[in-house]
Amino acid sequence: SVCSYCDFSNNNPPADMAKWEKIQINATTMDKFCCNNNIMPDFIKMDIEGAEMPALEGGMKTIQECRPQLAISIYHSNEDFINIPLYLNKNLKNYHFKLGHYSPWRSETVLYAIPQEIKF
């Protein structure tokens, strides 16, 4: 993966993104990270600027085994608004789904997935 870093200390505006230094970083999936570190999440929140679907795909085994509550942003693309709920509904058994919308515009729509064993 490639990660960009921006130094705003010299009042560089975001338009200077072409000048950002590019560095290589190691990345992993949620499944590998949780397994390697013996982590059993009970709540997962994702607002990762359109990377929610690949993150969910890389964490589905953990989500299925640990059954955490989820709060997943789905507003970054029209496809996410449709595909993320369909993907979760297909892959998660006995979950309730709810939408939360926190803006008068298209942004800030969150899909909540709550295991049925959790009463709300």
Task: Please give the residue ranges for each predicted region.
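Phosphate/nucleotide-binding beta-alpha loop and adjacent structural elements of enzyme active sites
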Residues: 1-120
